[in-house]
A protein has these predicted regions:
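Short conserved catalytic/interaction loops centered on acidic-Pro-aromatic/His motifs
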Residues: 149-158
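A structural signal for well-ordered alpha-helical segments within the folded catalytic domains
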Residues: 134-145
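Sec-exported extracytoplasmic/periplasmic mature domains
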Residues: 117, 144-149
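Non-Sec secretion/translocation targeting segments of pathogen effectors
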Residues: 199-213
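Extracellular LysM carbohydrate-binding repeats and other cell-envelope/extracellular binding modules
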Residues: 161-162
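Non-catalytic ligand/cofactor/substrate-binding and regulatory segments of enzyme domains
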Residues: 1-134, 165-199
């Protein structure tokens, strides 16, 4: 029987660039959920394919639980939104006991309200000519470091922002996954059980994030 796993994948863009994201898989290899950083319209709270106006578009973390049982376990509604496509480059970043893998995944979910509360501008067309680029690939790195898994690169694809994070290093260290006792790992994470979700500043998208994480 296979272990649960956390997989890194790359959605190829225009043949040369890529949007990296995370997939949670069960022991049969089924995709239970996806984690993304996406450009999001500040006024409507909806994600968009690419940010084109830094004044209007912000970087947000999004969680899409696909499996009904998993969604129910975390108090969310199943969401069919998916960036999975056949033939995408993929790397398994972690595999193992179900409770350990879920604990890693949920460490990222717990940090989402803080990530989104920063209301970071999404750079026009995904990159900045001057200054650090903080974009969807930066969210990918941040979420991976929060889960305590290796953050792979994908050769032969441009990934602007992959070397940057959404939070300072010391804050990531404070929030990241740490080894837990078996009893703690087996506790089911729900947003209501985590005070940080309720203390985060409210934004147009915050209700969606709480309902999906």
């Amino acid at each position: 029987m296979r272990d649960h796993s956390i997989e890194a994948r790359l959605l190829c863009i225009a043949g040369i660039a890529g949007h990296a994201y995370w997939v949670l898989r069960d022991e049969r290899g089924n995709a239970l959920a996806e984690l993304h950083g996406l450009a999001t319209d500040r006024h409507t709270g909806t994600p968009i394919p690419i940010g084109t106006d830094a004044r209007r578009h912000a970087l947000r973390a999004w969680h899409y639980p696909h499996d009904a049982d998993y969604a129910n376990a975390i108090g969310a509604q199943p969401d069919r939104t998916s960036y999975l496509r056949d033939g995408q480059p993929a790397r398994t970043a972690a595999s193992g006991d179900k409770h350990e893998i879920l604990a890693r995944w949920h460490a990222a979910l717990r940090a989402m309200p803080e990530l989104n509360a920063q209301d970071l501008d999404y750079p026009n067309y995904g990159f900045k000519l001057f200054g650090a680029t903080i974009n969807s690939n930066s969210a990918f790195r941040t979420l991976g470091e929060l889960m305590g898994v290796p953050v792979p690169g994908f050769p032969r694809r441009l990934q602007p922002g992959i070397g940057n994070c959404m939070l300072p290093r010391e804050r990531i260290e404070a929030l990241r996954y740490r080894e837990q006792s078996v009893q703690d790992r087996q506790r089911v994470y729900t947003p209501a059980s985590d005070a940080s979700c309720q203390e985060a500043p409210k934004h147009a998208i915050s209700q969606h994030i709480r309902s999906n994480s």
